[in-house]
Amino acid sequence: MNFKKLPKIELHCHLDGSLRVDTILDIAKKDNIPLPSYNEKELINYVSIMDDCNSLDEYLNKFFIPNKVMQTKENLKRIAFELLEDVAADNVKYIEVRFAPLLHVEKGLNIEEIIESVLEGIKEAEKLYDIKGNLILGCMRNMDIPSAFEVVKKGAKFIGKGVVAIDLCGGEEPHFPGKYVEVLKLAKEYGYRITIHAGEAGVGENVLEAINLLNAERIGHGIYIKNCAEAYKLVKEKNIPLEVCPTSNLHTKAFESYETHPFMDFLKDDIKITINTDNMTVSNTTITKELEMLNKFCGLSIEDYKTIYLNSVEAAFTTKEAKKRLKKFVE
């Protein structure tokens, strides 16, 4: 089965986890940014999981260097463009890129400039390739609540211009959703769609709270609903799509192998599974690689692929017209 040739959809891809390593080097040299190595083969060890990783927190350390080169409008635009260029080459037809604007203010850019630069890169790629992209704004859970309000308020002017949703991301603590009720209430009033990272690092109850307290329409990862019957039942009853990222889940030690990952059990039980990369560079992966691994180790069939693709179409934060276009690729 040639997954490379099949059309694909990416709903969970972090911009700062998906930079080309040669771009990091190029920008660092241009902007005089210190790196631990200026050799591409050595630098990759600092931005990708090459051998082993013991936790989500250790995984998140790989973002430090990429964010250093994402502090100017020019660089943000370039990096967004290159991401869409790369996924278009993998036959991805639609992508929702997510990033946290407040990680890119070190050199004085404001939130509006940051969002605008990323949107410019996305739109430039759309002109050249057979791909459409939208943007999800992330609020970092290790920042204070006023920071989250700031992202929601300042990003709202871009809703309908490429920004489609809000997300909470970063390290996951038990019962975090309770802190963000007012933030997400405001986001919903502005018209943001809502996806929340939850149930990635062992706490299935967070998925329950993300849906009940924050009105999450999709869940980033969500794999630990397997340990919370109430969350599992709610996800199934409400048809809440899960943005599953298998290789990333292995890297963060959520599971030991593809074979023990619960995605196939979820799929067979009609949970709305979508398959995504999470971070193409950090996890050294593509959507094609994800599908190939699931085919090799879990018996993913062409019928399963089509189910996942159509789940992704329905879950996408895009227009009815765009969804019709995406469905035609597999009809």
From Swiss-Prot:
Annotated cofactor note: Binds 1 zinc ion per subunit.
Signal sequence extent: none
Protein name: Adenosine deaminase
Pfam families, A to Z: A_deaminase
GO MF annotations in UniProt: 2'-deoxyadenosine deaminase activity; adenosine deaminase activity; zinc ion binding
Cellular component aspect of the GO annotation: cytosol
Entry-linked CDD domains: ADA (cd01320)
EC category: hydrolase
Catalysed reactions listed for this entry: adenosine + H2O + H(+) = inosine + NH4(+); 2'-deoxyadenosine + H2O + H(+) = 2'-deoxyinosine + NH4(+)
Active site: 200 (proton donor)
